[in-house]
Amino acid sequence: MERKGELPELLCPAGDMNALYAAILGGADAVYVGGRRFGARAFAKNFDIEELTHGLRYCHLHGAKLYVTVNTLLFDKEIEEALEYCRELYKIGVDAVICQDVGLISAIRGALPDFEIHASTQMSVNNTPGADTVHSLGVKRVVLARELKLSDVESVVKNSLAEVEVFLHGALCVCHSGQCLFSSLVGGRRGNRGECAQPCRLPYSEGYQLSLKDLSLAGHIPALIESGVASLKIEGRMKSAAYVYTVTKIYRRLLDERRAATGAERAELAEAFSRGGFTDGYLTGKFNGMTGIRSERDKEASRARAAEFTPGIIKKTVYARAEIALGKPATLTLFSKERSFTAIGAVPEPARSSPLTADAVKERLSKTGATMLSLPKENIELTLEGGLNLSPSEINALRREACAGFESCDREAPEIKMPSCEQIPTRKMTTALFLRPELAVAVGESIAKYFDTVFVPLFDRAALAGKYGVYIPPVVTDGELSSVRQRLAEAKNAGATHALITNISHITLAREAGLVGIGDFRLNVTNKYARREYMRLGVFESICSAELTLPKTRESGGAVTVYGRIPLMLTERCFMRRGVCSGKCPQDFSLTDRRGARFPIIREWGHRNLVLNSAVTFTADKPTEISALAARHFIFSTENEKEAAAVIAAYFEGGGYLPKDFRRIGSRL
């Protein structure tokens, strides 16, 4: 949605109430926070409903909005609880929820049709078809992938129906958002459930190649304004109030003055938090120098700034009109430019001795105490008939009711009924992805015998052989769409019938090409609601998230990845490149962690990389459990011909092959 030249919203983080106060003090237009559940920062302090209510009222009093993250992937039994939680958020007046799970988005839209939804960056939206597909779900705003160049951001803004939000400052993941399984499958802490252990910050055989410097686009403010994005987002719900205030204050100034940061302002940003400097490499497409770690100097600078800072509460100055007249209830109206509220109190009585005085009434009305309001006596317009009495407790009650009503953001919330979602039987199929198509050719006889569909990378020449389905690359930017569309048309004309959909945007691309879409595990289907919604969008069947255990896959339905090295990361940067790209990628490139585990890295289309798991998911020795699955999926990547043949024999012919290092589905079988 184009807004060229309009000043975008400055959206700031808050992990606790002090950080929220700091964001408002710094000049935030909106603040985003997490609740105690269903948020992607499970280890932040976060907010309970009472704190959310207080924070929301504080934001609204100061002309800011409050968004709440409900952006983890959900299991079937959690959808109803999450929907009821969203109803509570709606009731207290939250401006929008930020979501990742397609099943939850569908449930919210059905139960709370006017509740604003923003699509989390975890949905991996990186092009216009993706943004429009998400918009069709009832989502107003899309948070784009952080890895996009400015030209690609501009294209989505210009061509999509959705509002566009981009990240402005803060921590960067080396993996495309929503696509990282490293912490989950290696360490048991699921990033898509808010538990990321940040293995990317650890050293590997190539050094700290997974640890990126923090993002800072302070040098690109004029271009970002001109791009027409609706919102610029600062990361940092795990950061201190001092960090939030400093970063918000500087970007507020830069936006208002429509200029890039000075050297002094960059230095101040670095003092707030830095990993050896900042990077703008994704926006500019210049990846050199993107990695960095926290030095002792960085840590000391942040500690010193945090120790000096106390946010404090800014009280909202309001005005009042009060009327106390014989025979009528006393009234008090509080008002500002943005809102007003009238409270009705007790009926005054004729005074027996000392009647009310204007000064005494104003004195009591101005005592706003622990509220968020300030009401100076000079801001009170009082109409007072003489000879009347209203007790101090009655005046205080009138003031309390007026303050509470003025602060309140509550709205009527409908009683919600959980949308019915009958379990859809899993469609029977056995599929395989060969990331090295020459391996598919080598074991061709077995493929024809045991697999319904075999997928090969779209841009490999095997994709035009006519007998394979095509694996659409997980990242396709607007600048790459024409190449992908052309290649899909060529594959279709050559005889391809199916496409492996690894991103929500591919639903449109596959439909345009006339191909049957199979949803890859990267669509992050973890519940039957999401699976049903993808079917409604045109996906024939989905492969469950690789994070689901076998019992969880029975709840959601869908295909299960029973074999293969699961891709843990999809990176925009190429680890194999040394200087100018020769186009000849090494066949045996990997990273090794401190325990000696080796993670193979293979080339993805567009000079991107896939980091594969060190351990192979293997289940052939559990034939009873596996044979009960209606749909199974295999991934072949680093195997040689002999290994691939042995794997196929183990699953389909009773062979005794057992890999050296293997793991089970999800976290256990």
Task: Name what the model sees in each region.
Residues 1-26, 30-42, 53-56, 62-90, ...:
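Surface-exposed amphipathic alpha-helical tracts and adjacent flexible/coil segments at the periphery
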Residues 106:
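A cross-family signal for key residues in well-ordered alpha-helices
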Residues 47-52:
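Glycine-rich, highly charged phosphate/nucleotide-binding loops
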Residues 121:
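Residues at the C-termini of beta-strands that transition into short coil/loop
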